[in-house]
Amino acid sequence: MFYSQFILAKKGPLGTIWIAAHLERKLRKNQVADTDIGVSVDSILFPEAPIALRLSSHLLLGVVRIYSRKVNYLFDDCSEALLKVKQAFRSAAVDLPPEESTAPYHSITLPETFDLDDFELPDNEIFQGNYVDHHVSTKEQITLQDTMDGVVYSTSQFGLDERFGDGDTSQAALDLDEAVFQDKDVIGSDDEGVPGIDHNAYLDAAAPGIKDSMEGVSEAMPMDFNEEQVEDLAMNNEFIEDAQAPQTPGLVEVPNSSSVREQMACDDHMDVEDLNAEEGIKSSGELNANEMPKRGEDLSSEYNAPESAVTPVEVDKSQIDENVNTQNEPEEERAEHVHVTSPCCSHITTEMEDPGQVMNEAGANVVPDKPDAVPPLETPGEENRDHFAIATEVNQETDSSLQGDEQAYSRPDGQLNNAHETDEQLGNLTGFTDSDFPPPEKVLAVPNRQGDGNDFMVESTPDKEDPGTCNDDAGNNNITGKKRTFTESTLTAESLNSVESVGLIQSKRTADSVPDDDDLLSSILVGKSSFLKMRPTPVLEPATTKRLRSAPRSTATKRKVLMDDPMVLHGDIIRQQLTNTEDIRRVRKKAPCTVPEIVMLQRQALEDGLFKEPIFTGMSVELVSLHTEPYDLRGIMIIENDDRHASVGAVEDNECSVTAVEENKTEESSDPQAHPNDCEEQPGTAHTHPQEEQTINQQEELKDDNELAEKSDLEVLKEGNGAADEVNLVVIDDVSQIPSEEKLDRVEDLQVEESHENHDGEGGQDVCADPNEKSCTDVIEIAEGDTDINPIFNEMDLKVEDELPHEDEKTDASAEVSELGRDDQTPCDNTVGSTETGCLEAGDLSNMALENCNEPLVEANSDGLNPETESYNKYEPHNEMSNEEASMQNALDGEHTSRDGLMGDNDEMDTMENAHDTGFLNVDDDEVDEDHEEDDIQYDDETRLLENSGWSSRTRAVAKYLQTLFDKETENGKNVLVADKLLAGKTRKEASRMFFETLVLKTRDYIQVEQGKPYESIIIKPRPKLTKSIF
């Protein structure tokens, strides 16, 4: 393959192409954008230097990938641009009726001269009707047509209802001339001769200048009321409900500690009074003109009083409605008294107690209201009655041009004609509380929905509604001129949530609809009104703890879900899944917690190995180790000499060298027993008995100690008459661990040597093993022969305290005597007699010692593991040598522990040696280097090879470790190590480090590694370099 290096260079013409073919993810977007596909293809087709076919194919693949990346980038950019365009021109989903899809031009277009600073209250020409305001809707849209000629109403919408402006500006409309109301009283008078009654003259209690304007109102109010004329008030209790003042007849004063706005919301709930009272006054003409000034003064004083309480008014109805009601209506069916709450007047206390003078003294306090449909009380012939209402607000102005619906209710007797004229001048106020309505600004922001019929307001539930009167003029029944109260503009969180979420607000506009007075801003800017309708609150479904399904359950058969469809999880669903996972929680199995449960679980995992485990639980570690310890009984041989004695000879491997003699009274036993001989106190020699001379006369050996108790263990009697005589019992340790017969030949003539000094200062005598003599020596010495390898015998100095406090007290010597034969898995019990490797004698025993029965008794178990010491002498003084002997015993134990790893065969030796000598495998190189810095200084450069100067500390440690093992193996006659034995019991980390360092030594030709077949044991052999080097 030949090509120019410049072609595939990083800045070459095809460098990016080659990267795209092999390392597509390494390309950046700017690299893809800068690549010219045409130029690249031409460079491949017509290269400067010949290109191999394989390279050209790779380059073409890179071109294709770059082109694909470019297409993807372009597609993403186009998709993003299209999405932004759609979002920019996307219209909100507004549910508008067809006729309101487009708004009139003048409703959505502001005049060029519109300026908020130009909003000044006009002069008196407002009241003369000569002022034209171009910033409001036309007069035809906001004014109802009435039949009265000459009545001029102001078209101004400015007043207390507008929300903008300072306090002085909002109160400016209250400076009304008294003549305006007086003229309206004359115009609105009836042909009955009663002076003109202007119901718009009821001003709010907080309005300034109300005292002067109340004089015209007081003249228009009736003086007397009878019980029959207000009987309909009992049927309209729902119209009298007030959120701040409870409707309690006995409640005289209810303090209102709320704010001014809350008092305003309370005050706009008008008292309801039957219109028949006024009609009765008009028809009867019973008006006491002399009491009118008094009532005017009372009314003015009541309005000037602070608004802190709402007082119920007890009205005498005995003189009301006697002319309006039908002639055949019984009077006894009418209500006697009605307690009417009057929230717009505050302190009416003592004047209310006299029913006969209620209206004479506080006639202005009874404010009538007109509901939509108020049926008569048990009167079949009376279809309907006209009511009137005066809506007032505390911080609002009293508009002299209130608009009202033309309610043409039919009356058979024709007695309510004047009431129609009154209704045309007054705005009708419904009898429900509209405190749940949001302000018009929020209502305008709600999308318009199709209204249901003519019911835009709260669906009231009149007691007895006459369908004939309400449905005949359904088109004109809209309360378009109603003044929205301040409570309607007050919005709570609950009402807002219910309005916006459930969609209870309904808006309806008709051709003759007129904006409300308090919705001035919307009438100026938009030109539409916000008539409201509330539907009954739907019944909430009970909440369930289970998670709702994201998709409805389909009864049809399952079909394959298209994975291309977008899967969208709503935020509420994800939040619910994060906060509550009860429905997806699964019941878990009970895990074993107690010890028996865990043991049972472990036993189940054992399967077949269960039969090899003990059935008892909770055993100590010692018992478990004894149970798990393997025993090899193949090398044990028992030789019976006579009926009373069983002498166990040396096994084929010559594994034990303990002489034991059993008494006559005992049964056949293999427990070794050491006994004193009947010789003088002069020193004797230790005997090495061959196998054929194992028969010993029991009577001669036990002639002086027949009084001793039977012992199946090793017994040593000691003299205890106060002298510091000691019996240094040297037990031949684990000769059974000698693996081969070659070792037996070397140690056949081992001699026992032990130097000892008594506490009295007597020196021990050195004796040699002599098979012809049976004299007992004070000290038994065992020579190791001509080899220096693993010491075969452990010397133990078993000492017994001369005095123990109690007879039953025992001293456990297991802490002082090292375990014998533990490393060799074959125990030493059942082997007595002298072996070819050594003998055991007890010496320095006098006749007194043989006769003393109170001497301490030293018991050694047959396996040499747990010797027990018992003292039967309670009166002898404490031997001073006891502490010294114990310390000596501990020292011997440590010596035994360090040696016992080398006393068995090669397999066991490796196991024990590695457990103690391979700690360097767990040490890092840095720590090992610090330890060996001083060691390196000791050696001269001439004594070590130059080749291992650059080795790591761990490599040197492994080489030294192998060198030591090979030296010991050479002494044993072997020159081979098995890797499996070296790595037995090691962790994975230690084994890996050992294996690596072995390979290093093999590479440097320090060792030879062989493996005959795969998966067989690896054999390690030393090389001359290893034996000559010093590490």
From Swiss-Prot:
The entry's keywords: Cell cycle, Cell division, Centromere, Chromosome, Chromosome partition, Mitosis, Nucleus
Annotated localization: Nucleus; Chromosome, Centromere
Pfam families: Rad21_Rec8, Rad21_Rec8_N
Comp. bias (Basic and acidic residues): 742-762, 803-825
InterPro entries listed in its UniProt record: Rad21/Rec8-like, Rad21/Rec8_C_eu, Rad21_Rec8_N, ScpA-like_C, WH_DNA-bd_sf
Tissues where this protein is expressed: Expressed in tissues containing dividing cells such as seedlings, flower buds, flowers and inflorescence meristem tissue.
Region (Disordered): 461-481, 661-703, 742-772, 803-835
Phenotypic effect of disruption: Decreased sister chromatid alignment along arms in tetraploid cells (4C) nuclei and impaired sister centromere cohesion, associated with a high frequency of anaphases with bridges. Slightly slower development leading to delayed flowering.
Gene Ontology biological process terms from the UniProt entry: cell division; centromeric sister chromatid cohesion; chromosome segregation; double-strand break repair; sister chromatid cohesion
Main location: nucleus
Motif (Nuclear localization signal): 545-552
One annotated Gene Ontology cellular component of this protein: cohesin complex
Similarity remark: Belongs to the rad21 family.
Function of the protein: Involved in sister chromatid and centromere cohesion during mitosis.
Description of how the protein assembles with itself and partners: Component of the cohesin complex.
Name the record gives this protein: Sister chromatid cohesion 1 protein 4
